[in-house]
């Protein structure tokens, strides 16, 4: 697994450096490569969303089965699998796309943390190898994180509602000392995720 991860890192490092040679700015290279990766992974994102929607539709029937066979675990499992087969739903369908995406996104994150960003490279007001001096990127990352959770919908659970406000603050605290290049990747990736989520929800409406 580590061998595949290292290969991914080498490929992504090559992609970043090659893009930088053509565009002449490492910040723009980070944005372009992040967008490219997100586009490549879009079919998996759509597949994951479709699988999650199918599972959501089955929830009322799954609850009935759970109540009916609450004291018979074996029959509960049999009836649950029968329901999945009947509706041609794979319960792991929502997990598999994530398992494919995560190594790629972590590899890109790892490449940017490894010192690949040239020490003298800059983008807008910031030096990419240093933290954002005005803390604009950490605040934007927190705001986009909040927007992302709002798009996904609020839960009736009080703890989950609190997390919707706590998590963006945690994002700001975690990221404010990170190199600006890493924060730029994080922001670009999150913004694309928000745009994707918006259009997926609009399509399903």
UniProtKB/Swiss-Prot annotation:
GO terms for cellular component: plasma membrane. Its main location: membrane. It is a multi-pass membrane protein. GO terms for molecular function: membrane insertase activity. GO terms for biological process: protein insertion into membrane; protein transport. InterPro entries: YidC/ALB3/OXA1/COX18, YidC/Oxa/ALB_C, YidC_ALB_C. It comes from the Bacteria. Pfam families: 60KD_IMP. The chain crosses the membrane at residues 26-46, 92-112, 181-201. Keywords: Cell inner membrane, Cell membrane, Chaperone, Membrane, Protein transport, Transmembrane, Transmembrane helix, Transport. It is found in: Cell inner membrane. NCBIfam families: yidC_oxa1_cterm. Interacts with the Sec translocase complex via SecD. Specifically interacts with transmembrane segments of nascent integral membrane proteins during membrane integration. Required for the insertion and/or proper folding and/or complex formation of integral membrane proteins into the membrane. Involved in integration of membrane proteins that insert both dependently and independently of the Sec translocase complex, as well as at least some lipoproteins. Aids folding of multispanning membrane proteins. PANTHER family: CYTOCHROME C OXIDASE ASSEMBLY PROTEIN COX18, MITOCHONDRIAL, OXA1. Belongs to the OXA1/ALB3/YidC family. Type 1 subfamily. This is Membrane protein insertase YidC. It comes from Fusobacterium nucleatum subsp. nucleatum (strain ATCC 25586 / DSM 15643 / BCRC 10681 / CIP 101130 / JCM 8532 / KCTC 2640 / LMG 13131 / VPI 4355).
């Amino acid at each position: 697994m580590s061998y595949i991860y290292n290969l991914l890192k080498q490929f992504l490092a090559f992609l970043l450096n090659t893009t930088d040679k053509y565009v002449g700015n490492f910040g723009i290279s980070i944005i372009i490569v992040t967008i490219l990766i997100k586009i490549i992974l879009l079919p998996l994102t759509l597949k994951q969303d479709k699988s999650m929607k199918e599972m959501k539709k089955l929830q009322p029937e799954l609850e009935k089965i759970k109540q009916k066979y609450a004291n018979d675990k074996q029959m509960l499992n049999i009836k649950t699998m029968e329901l999945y087969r009947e509706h041609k739903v794979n319960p792991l369908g929502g997990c598999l796309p994530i398992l494919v995406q995560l190594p790629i996104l972590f590899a890109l994150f790892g490449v940017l943390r490894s010192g690949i960003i040239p020490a003298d490279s800059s983008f807008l007001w910031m030096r990419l190898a240093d933290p954002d001096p005005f803390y604009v990127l950490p605040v934007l990352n927190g705001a986009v994180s909040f927007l992302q959770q709002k798009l996904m919908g609020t839960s009736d659970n009080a703890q989950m509602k609190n997390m919707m406000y706590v998590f963006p603050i945690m994002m700001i605290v975690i990221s404010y000392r990170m190199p600006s290049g890493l924060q730029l990747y994080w922001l670009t990736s999150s913004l694309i995720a928000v745009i994707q989520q918006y259009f997926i929800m609009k399509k399903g409406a």
